[in-house]
Structures are given as C-alpha cells and as structure tokens.
Amino acid sequence: MSELERSRYATLYGPTVGDRIRLADTDLFIEVTDDLSRGPGGTATGDEAVFGGGKVIRESMGQARATRAQGAPDLVITGAVVLDHWGVVKADVGIRDGRISALGKAGNPDTMDGVHPDLVIGPGTEIIAGNGKILTAGAVDTHVHFICPQQVPEALGTGVTTLIGGGTGPAEGTKATTVTASPWNLHRMMSAMDGWPVNVALLGKGNTVSEDAMWEQLRAGAAGFKLHEDWGTTPAAIDACLRVADASGVQVALHSDTLNEAGFVEDTLAAIAGRAIHAYHTEGAGGGHAPDIITVASFANILPSSTNPTRPHTVNTLDEHLDMLMVCHHLNPSVPEDLAFAESRIRPSTIAAEDILHDLGAISMIGSDSQAMGRVGEVVTRTWQTAHVMKRRRGALPGDTVADNNRARRYVAKYTICPAVAHGLDAEIGSVEAGKLADLVLYEPAFFGVRPSLVLKGGFIAWAAMGDANASIPTPQPVLPRPMFGAAPGPAAASSLMFVAPAALQDGLDERLGLAKPMVATADVRRRGKADLPENTATPDIRVDPDTFTVRIDGEAVEAAPAAELPMAQRYFLF
C-alpha cells in the first residue's frame, strides 16, 4: 500500500492525529488527539470525504443515494479540527434541521468503510470544506448593553452568536446597566431582535424589593435579572432578587456596590447566602466593591466572569479605563467625588491577579460589556490574548507538553459552554455536540480568534469573509466580513432562539407576542455552581490588602507585569 508523507496528507485532507496547529500568531498550539473523519478507531483511511472536481464526494462514489427523508444531513463540514471544552479532534460534522446531527466520518456506506449512520451524504447534502480549518462553537457574550443595533454585525463578524444582557438603546440607563425593564420595553426589544441572526436572552431589573415587579418582568420575557449598583444593589435588593430567582429558576447577574455605601463585600456575600449568582467583571474595574470584589471568585456558589477591556493586563489598560468609566457612569471629572469614585475602581494589582485567576480556571467566563466599558467585537480575541500572555509568563499547564490542549480547552470554554451553563442555555448552545443548535465558527488557523472564515447560525451561513461581489470568483480583495443569506430576517429568525424564563411560556407569551424567532425557556440554574463550569472550577483562597491593594492567591502575592506587546493585534488590524 502506498503511503503519503504527513505534510502531504495535511495539505490534501487537513491535519490528523499528532499534528499540531498554531493558533493565529500566538505561542499557543493545539494537537489533534483523534481523527473521527477516518471512521471508528481512525482506521478507514484513503477515502476521506473531500469535495471538488475529480474528488470523492460525487455520485455513487462519496455521495450515496440517500434522500433527506432517509436521514441524509442538510450540510456536512468535512475534515475540520474541532476545538471545544471536551477536546481537540478532527471530524466531519453533520447538520440537519439546523442542529448538529453527528461528528464522525461522512460519505457513502456503499463504497466507504466506517461511515457514521447520521453522516450519509445524499443528493440533498451541501458541503463546506473544513479541511485544514478549526471549528468552534459560536461565542456567547454574557454581558451586552443593547445600546445600538450595529453591535450585532460587529459581534457576528467575530463569531459571537448569542447575546445575553439588556437595554433599550442609547438611554442613560442602558449605557450604564444591562437592564431591559418593564414588559413594554421587553416586548419592543424582543421584536427588534427578531430579525437578527443571534440568540438573545434579555435581563430584567432586579434592583427592587418588590417581588411582583420582578415576576411581571419574567412573565413578559426576561430570561433573568441584573442587579446593578447604579440602580442600588443593596443587601435587601440582592436577597429579594435571589428569592424570586430561586422560585423561578433563572440566573441573576451582579454588579455590586463600588462605594461600599450599603455594605462591604462581606455584606453582599451574606445577602447572597450561598445561592448561585453570576458575578460580572469580578476583578472590579468594571464595578463592584472596592478594592476586594475579586475575592468572590473563591466561593463555589459564585459564577465569576470578566469583561474584555482588562483582558489581558497591558501597559495601556489603566490609562484607557479612567476615561471609559467617566463616560459610562455619567461622571464629571471636575467633581472630586466623581473622580475618586473612578480612581477607586482602577487597580493594577487586581487586574494583574485577574490574569492569573483566569489561567487557574478560577474566573470562569469572559464577556464584552459592550459600549459600556467593553468591546462587543473583541470577546474572542481578548480571551486568546490572555491565554498567550499566561503561557509566556507561567509556562505550560499541568498535562500540557508539546501542545496546549488543556489551556485551549479552558479558554474556549470561557466564552462558549461556561456562560451557556451559567444562564441555563447549555441544552441548546455552547458546544459542538450532537443535538445542539449548529451555531458554529470556522477559522483558517492563521486567523483563529481574529477573523472567521464562516459563521453558521442554526446551520445556515450568516456571516463570512467575502471578496468583491462583482468579481468573477469569491476571493478578490477587499475580503471583508459580510452578511450572508442567513442574515436575512426570515432565515435569521428561523435559525435563532429567544431565551425567556419558564414563567413567560407558562403565561402564553409566545402566542401573544407572535415573534418569528422561537421562544425557548431557560433551564433551572439555581443549583448550579462553579463546579458545573467545564475546565473553570477552581476556588483558590484570594485576599486583598485594603491599604496596598496587594492580591494574594493561595498565599502568594501577585506582581503586576503588564504586557507591552500582544498577538492578534496590529498584524491583523489597520485601526
């Protein structure tokens, strides 16, 4: 039997077991640990499913006679390297009815060995060539201020397919807080998001001791609550909100009291009383008890996240934050009290500790804080920049040797499965697994985490790197991220979900509101804790000196070492 050199095989079919792939221009490498596209055991070599002139997927060769009614998939992505929280494997990925049907070997079982029964390519099967590319789940941005609709294409162009947050546009409340309050506002925003190819979960206002006011929002379509200090995050409000959350099953996102007016971090923890809660921007630059809100990442019931402007700590981080904070929280730099408020939130020691806590898996998620001290199009990029900086500073994670699979699995989970689990969306989205919505992002390795080749929303191409539309082929410059047919309002609604509290469906909201986008109830998250966040479960002891702001993690002081240079930056972007 003739053999191919490994390099020749990779050129023809993409990398296979033992091959390593560099992620963009970072120091991070992933290694393929299994090749499902070769069939069970990786032994069915020589007839890999490849599309093109003179290639495999042709009638009575790699294409079988199976009709859609007989189970043929609508789409197969061939030979992609899947990077997910559960591993790094090569596979053909089948999609049917907008959901992932299987990972395995695709083709024609009449002529090929080891074909997965749910990956039989028929005349009705479309093909995307994933060979040599990396496939991830669509990103979940768990901290979105809905300030302007233009955020949606910016997010989609970077692989974000789910938006969790709140707002009504550029109102002062929205510019500061991720809240869509009142049934009328919720219904207007749900209608506004109906034609965009993104999943949406809107958060209602939890800053009240009126349980009736909170239940009213849940029945109107809120998928959870936001507690924000600008509305008054008092211990009484925290307790009342969590009581309603426990009764309804939804998540609560917390932005605590920076000024410590109603209590200190210990008082907030006492009000939480061991109940599950999602702590936004846990480091504190985005808000929260100064200077020690970061200590909440020690607790098993706290689901901690970061927002991306502090990711990772660089020589420019502190300077840009002061101006951002003044605008976002409606402060006046000429008022001494406002300036003191702003400066109390920007601490190099806690930002440096945030880097380490992400690498340990102690801070579990990363979101944007879009246009409110964060950038909606940089969730994915900032995550991998953090991973790169941590590898340079801390070396390989336990279990990693020539490749960084453990670190890659930890970091990809921070913007996919972990936020999905935290908000009760993981039955539908968050990973590349059979049965889930086919929200998928395909990258050339050199552009990983920076510019996707394709973004699939519910199995249909919604966004892509596309050349001049008047050219004779798709590739002539300028190649830009552009909306595709899946971004049109009809397929966008059909391929996306509107997440709501169970109480909304029980109250018949889906029938009353009449959205094109299907409404799906969030799962009960009240018994979920950090232990349920894949690859990000650590609960180290974290202490902050109240005078010097020095942070100690398991007794070891963190020294600030801001990065002066990052990958995935000017090499890819002009501006």
From Swiss-Prot:
Binding site for Ni(2+) 2: 226, 255, 281
Group of enzyme by EC: hydrolase
Record-given protein name: Urease subunit alpha
InterPro entries: Amidohydro-rel, Metal-dep_hydrolase_composite, Metal_Hydrolase, Urease_alpha_N_dom, Urease_alpha_subunit, Urease_AS, Urease_asu, Urease_asu_c
Annotated EC: 3.5.1.5
Encoding gene (name): ureC
UniProt KW Ligase keyword: no
UniProt entry tagged with the keyword Endoplasmic reticulum: no
GO molecular function: nickel cation binding; urease activity
Annotated Ni(2+) 1 binding sites: 143, 145, 226, 369
Similarity field: Belongs to the metallo-dependent hydrolases superfamily. Urease alpha subunit family.
Gene3D superfamilies: Metal-dependent hydrolases (3.20.20.140), Urease, subunit C, domain 1 (2.30.40.10)
